[in-house]
From Swiss-Prot, chain A:
Gene3D superfamilies assigned: 2.40.50.100, K Homology domain, type 1, Nucleic acid-binding proteins
Gene: rrp4
Subunit structure: Component of the archaeal exosome complex. Forms a trimer of Rrp4 and/or Csl4 subunits. The trimer associates with a hexameric ring-like arrangement composed of 3 Rrp41-Rrp42 heterodimers.
Domain KH per the UniProt entry, residue ranges: 136-194
Coiled coil: none
Protein name: Exosome complex component Rrp4
Functional description taken from the UniProt entry: Non-catalytic component of the exosome, which is a complex involved in RNA degradation. Increases the RNA binding and the efficiency of RNA degradation. Confers strong poly(A) specificity to the exosome.
Organism name: Methanosarcina mazei (strain ATCC BAA-159 / DSM 3647 / Goe1 / Go1 / JCM 11833 / OCM 88) (Methanosarcina frisia)
Source superkingdom: Archaea
InterPro entries noted in UniProt: Exosome_RNA_bind1/RRP40/RRP4 (IPR026699), KH_dom (IPR004087), KH_dom_type_1 (IPR004088), KH_dom_type_1_sf (IPR036612), NA-bd_OB-fold (IPR012340), Rrp4 (IPR023474), RRP4_N (IPR054371), RRP4_S1 (IPR048565)
UniProtKB/Swiss-Prot annotation, chain B:
Disulfide pattern: none
Record-level Gene Ontology MF annotations: 3'-5'-RNA exonuclease activity; RNA binding
HAMAP family, alphabetized: Exosome_Rrp41 (MF_00591)
GO biological process, one term: gene expression
Provenance organism: Methanosarcina mazei (strain ATCC BAA-159 / DSM 3647 / Goe1 / Go1 / JCM 11833 / OCM 88)
Family statement drawn from the similarity comment of this UniProt entry: Belongs to the RNase PH family. Rrp41 subfamily.
Broad class of the protein's primary localization: cytoplasm
Name of the protein: Exosome complex component Rrp41
Sorted UniProt keywords: Cytoplasm, Exonuclease, Exosome, Hydrolase, Nuclease
Disordered: annotated segments: 244-264, 291-493
Compositional bias ranges of the Basic and acidic residues kind: 249-259, 383-400, 472-493
Length: 260, 493
C-alpha cells in the first residue's frame, strides 16, 4: 500500500515551500499536524485528514437546518462549529420579514452554498442558485465530513453507482450531510450502504465492495420476499374459503327456508 | 512520605521495585482509541493500575459566548476523579487538586494545539480517572493527547508525559502508589516529541543534580510512551489490508483532489460505465470541470424552455419588424442585428433578462474561483442560443442585404472597431459551439471594452488550450440535478 498514515508531528519534507494542507513548518521542515494520509504532489506536501470537524469554506455546497428565524436572517446549523447566516437578500426572490417563517421555518432543511467566510468565521450562506433549494421530501443521513470524498468516490464513481443500484436521488453536502430520496426500502438500503462506506472508508476497492454489498442485500430481499408473499397468499386463501363457505351456507339456508 | 511502615522496602538491594520494575522502567501501558461513540475523539488508557477515560469534543461553539476568543479556540480541560477511583471514596465534584491539575494539563496542551485555526470555538477535553494509582495526571495527558489526535484536531505533535521521583534516596521513573505515598519526591513532566517541556511540577525535595538525572530518565520514559502512542494511532487509522487492488493509485488521486479544502459539492449522475472501470487518472481540470458542469445544466434547461416558448410568440412580432430591419440593414449590417436582438430580448420579457443576468453573475463568481467552470458555462450556454440563429437564418433568406452580411464577415475584420465588436457579439449569440470558438478567436484579436467580450476572449484561449479535455469528459454524462429528480424538489417560487 502506498498510502502512508501520518500522525501529528511526523516529518513530511525538508522543502519548506511545499507546505500544504494539514501541515506546519518548524525549523525549515514540514511536519504533519493531523492524523491522515500523506499526500505527495510535485509542488505540495499535504495531509488528507481521516478525522476532524467540517470547517466551512467559500463555495462549499452544504445542507443546513434552520434553527432560528430573525427579522432579516435565517440562522442555520450546517454541521460545523459555526452557525450559518442566510440573509433574506440571498433568497432568490424578495421576501418580507413577516413571511420568512412561511418560506423557511425552524427545522427545515435546505441545500445552500457558502457565500462567504470571514476571518472571524462568520458564515454567510446563499440560496441564489438553481441547484439550491429547500428539501421537502427524503431523508438526511449524516456521515463524518472527512468521509464525504469516499461517498462521492473517484470522480463520482461511488455516488453514481449508488444512484444506479438503489434508484434513489442523492445529494452529498460538503458538510457530511447527505440527502437521499426514493422508495422507503431503497432509502433504507442506501443508508445502510452509506454507513458501510463510513465504516470502511479507508479500504481499497470500496466502490466494488459497496456494489457487492448492495447486490447481496437485494438478493436477500428477493429471497425473503417470496416467503412473505406465500404466507400472505395462504392467509388470503383461507379467509376467502371461510367467506365462501359462509356465503354458501347462507344461500343454502335461504333455499331451505320454508318461507320461500 | 509520612508514616511509612517500618518493614516496607520500596527498592530491593538488587534494584528491583515493588512491582518488579527497574528504576528506569515504566509501568505497562495499554491504550484503546475511539471508545466513545458520541465523542469526536476518545481514548481509554491503562497504565499500571491507572485507568483513564478521555473524551474530546470539538472544535465546537463555545458556551457561554463570553468565553469565546475572537482569534482562537478556547481549550478546556477537565480532570475529574471518579469517587470510586481511590480506596477511600473521593468527594465527587471539583476539588482544589483537580482544578489545579486541569489547569496545568490544559497549559501543557496549549502550545501544541493549533487553536488559531478555529476562532470562537471551544475544544473540550474531559478526563475521567476511573482508577487511580499514582501519576494520574501524566496518564491523563498521554490519553488526552491520543484523543485529540483521534478527534482530528490539528496539533504540532503529540504530548507525552511521565513522572520521576525519589524513592529511598534513589531516582526512579514512573512512581506507583506506594512509591508515591512513601517516597520523598514526585516530579511529573510533560513534553512534546522534540523534548520541549510543557508541564513540570514538583512535590517533595530534590537537588539540582537529582532533577537533571531525573529529567534524563523522563526523556527516556517519554520516548517509550511516544512510541506506544504513535503505534496506537497509526493502527487506528491504518487501512485494513485485504486485497491489494490496482485501483489504489487512482483512488488516492481522487481523494487528494476531492479532499482539497474547497471542492464544489458533487452531484454526479448515473454513469454506468464509470461504476465499473477504474478510470485513467483524471486530471484535476477535468475533475473540476465535472464538478463545475454539474452546476450548470439545470438553469440551461430552464432557459432553453423559456426561450423556446417565448420565441414562438415573438416570431410574429419579428416578421413585422423586418421592414424596419431591412432599411437599417442597408445602412449598417451589424446594427440591425443588434436591434433584432434587443427586440427579441424585450419580447422575451424581463424574466429572461434576469435569468441571463443571473447567469452572468454566476459565471463571474465561478470564474473567480474556477476558470474551467466558466468555460463550461459559456460553452454550454451557446447551444441554446441557436434559437436566435434559426430566426436569423430565416430572415436572411428573405433579405439579400442581410445575406450579404455573411460574405462581409471575413472582411469585417478590416472594418471599423465598432462594427467588429458588434459582429463578434452577433457571432457569440448565433454560433454553434465550434463557431463560437472561432468567433471568440476573432474577439480575442481586438481589445474590447466590454467585460463580456473580455470574458469571451479568455474563454477562447482556454477553449483552444484544452479541447481534448472537453472530449475526455465523454463518459461523464453529467448531470441531472437533484432538483429535477421527479419525486421531490421544486424551488420555492
Amino acid at each position: 500500500m502506498d498510502k502512508k498514515i501520518v500522525i501529528p508531528g511526523d516529518l513530511l519534507s525538508d522543502d519548506v515551500k511545499k507546505s500544504g494542507y494539514g501541515t506546519y513548518v518548524k525549523n525549515d521542515k514540514i511536519y504533519s499536524s493531523l492524523c491522515g494520509i500523506e499526500s505527495l504532489k510535485e509542488d505540495k506536501v499535504g495531509v488528507i485528514p481521516l478525522a476532524g470537524a467540517y470547517i466551512p469554506s467559500v463555495n462549499d455546497v452544504v445542507i443546513g437546518v434552520v434553527i432560528v428565524v430573525t427579522p432579516s436572517n435565517w440562522i442555520l446549523d450546517i454541521a460545523a462549529p459555526y452557525d450559518g447566516l442566510l440573509h433574506v437578500s440571498e433568497y432568490p426572490r424578495r421576501v418580507e420579514s413577516r413571511e420568512m417563517p412561511e418560506i423557511l421555518d425552524v427545522g427545515d432543511s435546505v441545500i445552500l452554498r457558502v457565500r462567504d467566510v470571514d476571518s472571524s468565521m462568520k458564515i454567510e450562506l446563499a440560496l441564489r442558485d438553481p441547484n439550491l433549494h429547500k428539501l421537502r421530501t427524503g431523508q438526511i443521513v449524516e456521515v463524518e465530513p472527512v468521509k464525504v470524498p469516499r461517498v462521492i468516490g473517484h470522480g463520482g464513481s461511488m455516488i453514481s453507482m449508488l444512484k444506479k443500484e438503489t434508484n434513489c436521488s442523492i445529494f452529498v453536502g460538503q458538510n457530511g450531510r447527505i440527502w437521499i430520496d426514493g422508495k422507503d426500502e431503497d432509502i433504507e438500503l442506501l443508508s445502510k450502504a452509506l454507513r458501510k462506506i463510513e465504516a470502511e472508508a479507508q479500504r481499497s476497492g470500496l466502490t466494488d465492495r459497496i456494489y457487492n454489498f448492495l447486490k447481496n442485500e437485494r438478493m436477500k430481499e428477493k429471497e425473503s420476499k417470496p416467503v412473505e408473499f406465500l404466507k400472505n397468499e395462504k392467509t388470503d386463501v383461507s379467509v376467502a374459503k371461510e367467506d365462501h363457505s359462509e356465503d354458501i351456507y347462507r344461500k343454502i339456508d335461504v333455499l331451505l327456508d320454508p318461507k320461500n | 512520605m509520612s508514616n511509612k511502615p517500618e518493614n516496607l522496602t520500596l527498592i530491593t538491594d538488587d534494584g528491583l521495585r515493588l512491582d518488579g520494575r527497574r528504576a528506569d522502567e515504566i509501568r505497562p501501558m495499554k491504550i484503546e482509541v475511539g471508545v466513545l461513540s458520541r465523542a469526536d475523539g476518545s481514548c481509554y488508557l491503562e497504565w499500571g493500575r491507572n485507568k483513564i477515560l478521555v473524551g474530546v469534543f470539538g472544535p465546537r461553539e463555545a458556551h457561554p459566548r463570553r468565553s469565546q476568543r475572537a482569534d482562537s479556540a478556547v481549550i478546556r480541560y477537565r480532570y475529574n476523579m471518579a469517587s470510586f477511583s481511590v480506596e477511600d471514596r473521593a468527594r465527587p465534584g471539583p476539588s482544589r487538586r483537580s482544578i489545579e491539575i486541569s489547569k496545568v494539563s490544559r497549559e501543557a496542551f496549549e502550545p501544541v494545539i493549533m487553536a488559531e485555526l478555529f476562532p470562537k470555538t471551544a475544544i473540550d477535553i474531559f478526563v475521567e480517572v476511573l482508577q487511580a494509582d499514582a501519576g494520574t495526571r501524566t496518564a491523563a495527558i498521554n490519553a488526552s493527547s491520543i484523543a485529540l489526535a483521534d478527534a482530528g484536531i490539528p496539533m504540532k505533535g503529540l504530548i507525552t508525559s511521565c513522572a520521576f521521583g525519589k524513592v529511598d534516596g534513589k531516582i526512579v521513573l514512573d512512581l506507583n502508589k506506594e512509591e508515591d505515598n512513601y517516597g520523598e519526591a514526585d516530579f511529573p513532566v510533560a513534553m512534546t516529541q522534540d523534548g520541549e517541556i510543557t508541564l513540570i511540577q514538583m512535590d517533595g525535595n530534590l537537588t539540582p543534580d537529582e532533577i537533571k538525572q531525573g529529567l534524563e530518565l523522563v526523556k527516556k520514559g517519554c520516548k517509550e510512551i511516544l512510541e506506544i502512542q504513535q503505534a496506537v494511532l497509526r493502527k487506528k487509522f491504518e487501512t485494513p489490508v485485504e486485497e491489494v487492488s490496482e485501483e489504489t493509485a487512482p483512488e488516492k488521486g481522487a481523494e487528494k483532489e476531492v479532499l482539497e479544502p474547497s471542492p464544489v459539492a458533487a452531484i454526479v449522475e448515473e454513469t454506468p460505465e464509470e461504476a465499473e472501470e477504474p478510470e485513467v487518472e483524471i486530471s484535476e481540470e477535468v475533475e473540476a470541470e465535472i464538478l463545475a458542469s454539474e452546476v450548470i445544466p439545470d438553469f440551461e434547461d430552464e432557459l432553453e424552455e423559456e426561450i423556446e416558448e417565448e420565441l414562438e410568440e415573438s416570431e410574429e412580432d419579428l416578421e413585422t419588424e423586418e421592414e424596419e430591419f431591412e432599411e437599417e440593414a442597408l445602412e449598417e449590417e451589424a446594427e440591425p442585428e443588434e436591434d433584432l436582438e434587443e427586440d427579441l430580448e424585450e419580447d422575451l420579457g424581463e424574466e429572461l433578462e434576469e435569468e441571463e443576468e443571473e447567469l452572468e453573475e454566476e459565471e463571474f463568481e465561478e470564474e473567480a474561483l474556477e476558470e474551467e467552470t466558466e468555460l463550461e458555462a459559456s460553452l454550454e450556454c451557446a447551444p441554446e442560443l441557436k434559437e436566435f440563429d434559426e430566426i436569423e437564418a430565416r430572415l436572411e433568406k428573405e433579405d439579400a442585404s442581410i445575406e450579404a452580411e455573411e460574405e462581409i464577415e471575413p472582411e469585417a475584420e478590416e472594418a471599423t472597431e465598432e462594427g467588429l465588436e458588434e459582429e463578434a457579439e452577433i457571432e457569440e449569440t448565433a454560433a454553434s459551439e465550434e463557431e463560437n470558438i472561432e468567433a471568440e478567436a476573432e474577439a480575442e484579436e481586438e481589445a474590447e471594452p466590454e467585460v463580456e467580450a473580455e470574458e469571451i476572449s479568455t474563454e477562447a484561449e482556454e477553449a483552444e488550450e484544452e479541447p481534448e479535455e472537453e472530449k475526455s469528459e465523454g463518459p461523464w454524462k453529467v448531470v441531472k440535478d437533484p432538483s429535477e429528480a421527479g419525486t421531490r424538489g421544486e424551488k420555492d417560487e
